Amino acid sequence: MEPEIYRRMGLTDAEFEKVKAILGREPNYVELGMFAVMWSEHCGYKSSRSVLKLFPTKAPWVLQGPGENAGIVDIGDGQAVVFKIESHNHPSAIEPFQGAATGVGGIVRDIFAMGARPIAVLNSLRFGPLDDSRTRYLMGGVVGGIAFYGNCLGLPTVAGEVYFEPSYACNPLVNVMAVGLIEQKNIRRGTAAGVGNAVMLIGARTGRDGIHGATFASEELSEASEERRPSVQVGDPFREKLLIEACLEIINEDLIIGMQDMGAAGITSSSCEMAARAGTGMEIDIALVPRREEGMTPYEVMLSESQERMLLVPKKGAEERIRAICRRWGLEAVIIGRVTGDGLMRIMENGRVVAEVPAKALTDQCPVYERERRRPAYLDEVRQRDLSRLPEPEDYGRVLLGLLAAPNLASKEWVYRQYDYMVRTDTVAGPGGDAAILRVKGTSKGLALTVDGNGRYCYLDPERGGAIAVAEAARNLACVGARPLAITDCLNFGNPEKPEVAWQFYQAVSGMSRACEVLRTPVTGGNVSFYNETESGAIYPTPVVGMVGLLPDIEKRCGIGFRREGDLLILMGETYPEIGGSEYLATFHGLVAGEPPALDLEREKAVQALVREVIAAGLATAAHDCAEGGLAVALAESALAGGLGAEVELASDLRPDFLLFSESQSRILLAVAPEARDRVLDLAREKGVRASVIGRCGGHSLVVRINGRTLFNLSLEEMGKQWRESIPVLMAR
């Protein structure tokens, strides 16, 4: 076989030799394609698998960790929550609407493949600067695609984040998280047990869309990528809705042994993963696969990533009942093969063997690389900058208004108003707060959901940035009163074959692992997205954390908005002169430099525990974490959310701009009734947390004084205008 054939599929010379050694012969074209997709970074995790072992994955409440379609955690009363996050970065860069739409469809299938009813979607998005017309095109397409698929499915998109940085200009990030609820007795896994059992394909017909989508997602983007539009799948959310209902009915009737979504690598991945988990094999006749296009080759059928398809292994005798259920939902259900006991994936076409490969060779024997790691030279340059010598602002009101208008901090209502976040009627707190809250019907419980990440911090210090991503997600849950349970992560990085990127990846995972250990948030699964890189360079290293938390009593929840005149403002935690990597530094000084804020995880843990206790006791009327933009922006956001101003008096030796815009970690702003003040301060003392009364809610302006000097007095109207109109105005250009 000519080297350019397997190289074009993404295999190296050494990997091709390993394939030959496993088979004892040269692979044919179909077999080569199967190895290429399953040994891609997207499916095989060959550059990340050894590093991912750093993550803590076990806890008494974790029912399913990494290795399945999605993670599962116990929430009591025989119920569990199923959740996972994945990326659809490369497809969205080429075809933003369909790339993002099918990102939603794929992650939702992972949820109901476990037997759970999907209940919510979240997303984490990264684009280039909004003054660029292509960025506006990409953002419009991505948001439209997410809205289209989620709204048509009848799933609320309840939370998310959107950031804009030059490093994402050519390579946007589209990370989508889905969440489901399940009775623990209904949990199913993707396994193909029982020799002789049928293998059924249900759902959509198979076409040529998405062929080699997995290998496309395992290479750098270039001008030639525009020609890869056939690698972008096309989604049909209405068919997926039918598929959800049919699959859940099949599970409720206990008709199957296992079920797997046909995502990346299509029939190839779903079949070999199910067989490998069970230690079995499969014989599949691709002539039986329903097709929507004529003349498809065995290679195309095996590698197609056509959407809205599931692979099932029914219990013996259940095949006709499954067909009847699918007919009722307007879906095809076809037996395409059977489970075998020889461990081989035997692919037939009308009685002819077109591929024969050991199932575990495709999964367990994927090469694992220990990539060379090297600290990037740029870190010395960006950290040498003496930020204490920056000029102080003359007009602090102008600075705050400018920060509120900065796209990273401005209202994202332009985005989330396109999503139906109230559908299903379980959304108690939707977009715009620190975390979304969904009720668990029939109980007093609530689920709290968030996604968080900061690529700028990770660019300056990936270990600290990774830890902060976990800490901030948990802090956001604490602000609504929820205890964090576990995380799913989406790790977005450049080319791992470059030592600097491999170093960033290792450092970020190390930091995340450290935070997960201290905060007791095990990792239940996720996704690694490498090769987010173009000729102009790599993206910022961007680990994104999706976190699920539990509210034992949904009535004891908190929001970010100031609600009552006369309530006192208490700042939990301490402020240090930490503006490295801050929004203030980037927006007003044009710099991405310095070190990101320090993170003391034990202090973080104490602050979060304190705030949860205060909220559970009914002592807080508002809670908001101090994150990007610092204390000043947190105050403005809470004032705008509640439609109520505040007067704040700070006493400090810090420079005013550092005090107001520092992004020091482990800080939460609380509003409490005056009569609750002493009890809250006593609780803080007991937990060793610094708590300072800094002001009072009231009026229609935000007034901030430092050491008796008024820094700004801004009306809610002028702040709201800057904050709300920024992104709509930019998108309308």
UniProtKB/Swiss-Prot annotation:
GO terms for molecular function: ATP binding; magnesium ion binding; phosphoribosylformylglycinamidine synthase activity. Pfam families: AIRS, AIRS_C, FGAR-AT_linker. InterPro entries: PRibForGlyAmidine_synth_PurL (IPR010074), PurL_linker (IPR041609), PurM-like_C_dom (IPR010918), PurM-like_C_sf (IPR036676), PurM-like_N (IPR016188), PurM-like_N_sf (IPR036921). It comes from the Bacteria. ATP binds at Y45, K84, D489, G526. Signal peptide: none annotated. Keywords: ATP-binding, Cytoplasm, Ligase, Magnesium, Metal-binding, Nucleotide-binding, Purine biosynthesis. It is found in: Cytoplasm. This is Phosphoribosylformylglycinamidine synthase subunit PurL. Part of the phosphoribosylformylglycinamidine synthase complex involved in the purines biosynthetic pathway. Catalyzes the ATP-dependent conversion of formylglycinamide ribonucleotide (FGAR) and glutamine to yield formylglycinamidine ribonucleotide (FGAM) and glutamate. The FGAM synthase complex is composed of three subunits. PurQ produces an ammonia molecule by converting glutamine to glutamate. PurL transfers the ammonia molecule to FGAR to form FGAM in an ATP-dependent manner. One of its GO terms (biological process) is 'de novo' IMP biosynthetic process. The active site is at H42, H88. Belongs to the FGAMS family. Its EC number is 6.3.5.3. One of its GO terms (cellular component) is cytoplasm. Mg(2+) 1 binds at E86, N527. Mg(2+) 2 binds at D110, D261.
